[in-house]
UniProtKB/Swiss-Prot annotation:
Gene name as annotated: REM2
List of residues binding GTP: G121, E122, S123, G124, V125, G126, K127, S128, N229, K230, S231, D232, A260, A261
Role this protein plays: Binds GTP saturably and exhibits a low intrinsic rate of GTP hydrolysis.
Name assigned to this protein: GTP-binding protein REM 2
Family that this chain belongs to: Belongs to the small GTPase superfamily. RGK family.
Compositionally skewed regions (Pro residues) per UniProt: 293-302
In-chain residues carrying the UniProt-annotated modification Phosphoserine: S27, S295
Biased amino acid composition, Acidic residues: 1-13
Source species: Homo sapiens
Example of a GO cellular component annotation carried by this entry: plasma membrane
Length: 340
């Protein structure tokens, strides 16, 4: 009798020694123990480490996810649903277009259908009014918009082909150190140098602006159009139509007069810019691109630096008198934006 009691007491003592003091009460069946939780955690960490070492190619631009960030929704799906790791993050829609200067390169097919036009020139000549007219804004005809936008994008039909035309009006906005202007030079497909026919000073700045454009992109055959704006102000005119065309012929540019206030020739201007871009691209693809400076067929690089103002004055003073007949003939076609 005493032997059975002693045996039961010995078994209880051994059970108490094996179990911790705080876990004497039996847990319900199916409840995970701390040891099981630790095992599952180690397995998860091991699986993540194996995925990191597997060398799976990640999608370009995929952000690194911290442990505190939520798991993407697609990874919360049931295990029965197949999920491709390369599907995240989602790719950008091809129907969108680039609206900023610092965007990345587009696909070739998309890039061919997007034309970026830069409005450049002195302040007060009507660049913002031209941009607003292109964007379809209805503003005061006597003043420029008080709060103009920076960029306008529209899809237009030119010669039975639909294109996306983006017009930038950022030449003077917060240009500390000229960084923004230099960025414009590297981004635009065509440049519209706007001057006011009522302000001769803005007209005299055109050669300097053009030289800056060509100095920033010396290896590119960029279309440039001289735009004489405010042609409706006949009594205040200081620059004649003949002077504008003559300067355009001298500088190998196109010329057009517009009135942004009356929407005169504004449609012809932007459609002509698209045609000029197409013509230049077609000529470059056909092998008719200008030779690079320094090559046997191109001009020699300048030996020393010279200010843009001096270059403009020397350029006009040397070329116009000797080749006046040539420039007169060239100026006759400078207003036709459908030909080179």
């Amino acid at each position: 009798m005493h032997t059975d009691l002693d045996t039961d007491m010995d078994m209880d003592t051994e059970t108490t020694a094996l179990c911790p003091s705080g876990s004497r009460r039996a847990s319900p069946p199916g409840t995970p123990t701390p040891e099981a939780d630790a095992t599952l955690l180690k397995k998860s960490e091991k699986l993540l480490a194996e995925l990191d070492r597997s060398g799976l190619p990640s999608a370009p631009g995929a952000p690194r996810r911290r442990g505190s960030m939520p798991v993407p929704y697609k990874h919360q799906l049931r295990r029965a649903q197949a999920v491709d790791e390369l599907d995240w993050p989602p790719q950008a829609s091809s129907s969108g277009s680039s609206d900023s200067l610092g965007s990345g390169e587009a696909a070739p097919a998309q890039k061919d259908g997007i034309f970026k036009v830069m409005l450049v020139g002195e302040s007060g000549v009507g660049k913002s009014t031209l941009a607003g007219t292109f964007g379809g804004l209805q503003g005061d005809s006597a003043h420029e918009p008080e709060n103009p936008e920076d960029t306008y994008e529209r899809r237009i039909m030119v010669d039975k082909e639909e294109v996306t035309l983006v017009v930038y009006d950022i030449w003077e906005q917060g240009d500390a150190g000229g960084w923004l202007r230099d960025h414009c030079l590297q981004t635009g497909d065509a440049f519209l140098i706007v001057f006011s026919v009522t302000d001769r000073r803005s007209f005299s700045k055109v050669p300097e602006t053009l030289l800056r454009l060509r100095a920033g992109r010396p290896h590119h055959d960029l279309p440039v159009i001289l735009v004489g704006n405010k042609s409706d102000l006949a009594r205040s005119r200081e620059v004649s139509l003949e002077e504008g065309r003559h300067l355009a012929g001298t500088l190998s540019c196109k010329h057009i007069e517009t009135s942004a206030a009356l929407h005169h020739n504004t449609r012809e201007l932007f459609e002509g810019a698209v045609r000029q871009i197409r013509l230049r691209r077609g000529r470059n693809h056909a092998g008719g691109q200008r030779p690079d400076p320094g090559s046997p067929e191109g001009p020699a690089p300048p030996a020393r630096r010279e200010s843009l103002t001096k270059k403009a004055k020397r350029f006009l003073a040397n070329l116009v008198p000797r080749n006046a007949k040539f420039f007169k003939q060239r100026s006759r076609s400078c207003h036709d934006l459908s030909v080179l």
